[in-house]
Each structure stands twice: as structure tokens, then as C-alpha cells.
Curated annotation (Swiss-Prot):
Organism phylogeny: Bacteria, Pseudomonadati, Pseudomonadota, Betaproteobacteria, Burkholderiales
Protein name: S-adenosylmethionine:tRNA ribosyltransferase-isomerase
One of the GO BP terms on file: queuosine biosynthetic process
Keywords, sorted A to Z: Cytoplasm, Queuosine biosynthesis, S-adenosyl-L-methionine, Transferase
Biological pathway: tRNA modification; tRNA-queuosine biosynthesis
Gene name in the database record: queA
Catalytic activity: 7-aminomethyl-7-carbaguanosine(34) in tRNA + S-adenosyl-L-methionine = epoxyqueuosine(34) in tRNA + adenine + L-methionine + 2 H(+)
Pfam families registered for this protein in UniProt: Queuosine_synth (PF02547)
Entry EC number(s): 2.4.99.17
Amino acid sequence: MLTLSDFDFDLPPELIAQTALPERSASRLLEVDNTNPSAPPRLVDRRFAELPACVAPGDLLVFNDTKVLKARFFGRKASGGKIEVLIERVTGERTALAQIRASKSPPPGTTLTLADAFDVTVGERVEPFFTLHFPDDCLVLIERHGRLPLPPYIEHAPDAADETRYQTVFAANPGAVAAPTAGLHFDDAVLAALEARGVERATLTLHVGAGTFQPVRVENLAEHRMHSESYELTDALVEKIAATRARGGRVIAVGTTSMRALEAAARDAQAAGRPLAATRAETDIFITPGYRFRVVDRLVTNFHLPKSTLLMLVSAFAGIETIRAAYRHAIDARYRFFSYGDAMLLTRRDDAAEATHGGA
């Protein structure tokens, strides 16, 4: 049985990318060819700008069009005590769920001043979050006064460059507190080259929550509880997936967030005895080796943290030994890791279920 320790590896800290490269598509791309089960994976070092040459006409790329909120606030209580607020999810025009760091948990009815700009009122507790009531449209106030919530392993304060580069060029629907980072490599030139090659594009929305950085704290993976995130698939996306299947093309998820949304929707549809359809729902899907993929054939993804649920996901998709070999190569070749790091292109191995935790 696989345990948390099976997904650990040593990463030199200098390989954690602290800033974005000057050009999005100048990042590196490790193409992993693991289609021959009797041979080691073939690892090809590329530039991300070469991605169009790695996919075929008639394939479908599925992007997550979520937009990162300026979700972090510093503020104070009426007593003058300092607080830090991280918006987790906008739940209404004037309400949101948030994490609050303070010397003492604020009870309902407490007034908090955020960014020396406006006051919010603390409402009911929705574990582990607090409900916040805003005086006006919270999306407007968040965008105007908040700070970009860079990941905890990025050590500098967010600056003007981050406000551009920690968003994808196709970000459209505000609601995330972390970027769908595989999408950060795509620029207009790469998108145009994909279109010229006859590769289709579609979007879904999954609002990435702060739980994406939550560590797994249990050795037995069956005991881990995933955070929940909201997602939406449209009729247009579902129709494009069906058309791609009909012409023999491959569905390529851009990022683990797109993967999780597609697979969650397909799993739930199958459980209900119906085909994949447009949906708006919540998912806490936890994909580990043994999971049977229903939609995604290939995956564009960044390099992930040791012991993370995302490392488990890519291991389920491509095979544990394939991922171990790819990560060893990436470290030896000095690839850049995590959100501002480089990317890899993986292909699903249907025999990758070397152990079972995630279930069908």
C-alpha cells in the first residue's frame, strides 16, 4: 500500500522559481513519452514554445479560465490588534468566506478594518472559515484594495510584474486565490500556433482555493481529506469533448485544476448513469494511483511539491516510476519548480494503477 513517504523527494531550494521568466513561453517543457510499458520513459527537453509540435491536429486543449483575486488583506480590529485576512471564496455580491489570522478568533458581529479602506463585519463560522459581510460589491473592493496572494514558497512581496504574470492570458472569471499555473506558460504566440496547427481550445472554470497549498499530514492517504472547490463545465465544452472523441483526437487538460474538474464531472455523471453534461458543482476529488481516468488523455502541468496531492495526481496519471524518473531528470537538468517554474507534458498510462487508493 502506498503511503505519504512514497511521494517524497529531495529538491534543492534554489530550483524553486521565485519570479516568472521575462517571456511566458520561454519556460522549459519536459515531454514525457511513457507509451511503451516495457521500456523506460523517453524524456525530451524542449522549450514551451514547442508545445504545438507535440500535439496533433484535432486534439482539444482544455484551459481553466479562473482569475486570481487580490485576496490578501492586512487590517485591524477595533481594539487596534493586527489581523490578516485571506479571502477563500466569494459567496455573494457582498459576502465571502475567509481565513482570519488574529491573536483571538473574532466572534460574530466583530468589525474589522481592511487595508485602512473599508470595514467588514464577521458573520457565522463555516469551518474552517469565517463569513465576512462587505459594505459594497466585494469583488470591486477586493480588486481595488487587496493584495495578490502569492504562494507561500515565493519569498518576495507581490509587485506589478506578479499582477500580470500570476494570471493567465485567458483569465476571465474572478474567484481563485491561486493561479492555475500550467496556464501561465501560454502566450498569444503559442495560442496562435496551436490554432494554426488545427488544435481546438475550450475552457472550464475551477476556482482554485488556498487548500491547494495544504500539506498532507497523514501517512495513510486514505485518511486525507481534500479541500472543496467550485467548478463549472459548459455545454460548449462538453460538445467539444464529444466531437474530439468522435474524430479520434485527444483531450489535453491544461493543469491539474482542469483535470480535476473534468474527472470529477465525469465520475459523478457515470455514478448517476448519465453521460457527461454541463454542470456547476463542488468537488473534493482526491486522485491517487489506482484512479481510473475517464476524460483526460494528456496533461500539461508544472512540477509539484514533495508529498503533495498534485504529485499523487500526476503519479496516478502517468505512473509512479515514470514520474520519479521525470523528476530525477528535471532536478539533474536544473528545471525550475512550482508555480513560476517549468512545465511537463504527460500521457495517460492505463496500466499506471500500481496501487489503489483513489478508487474508480
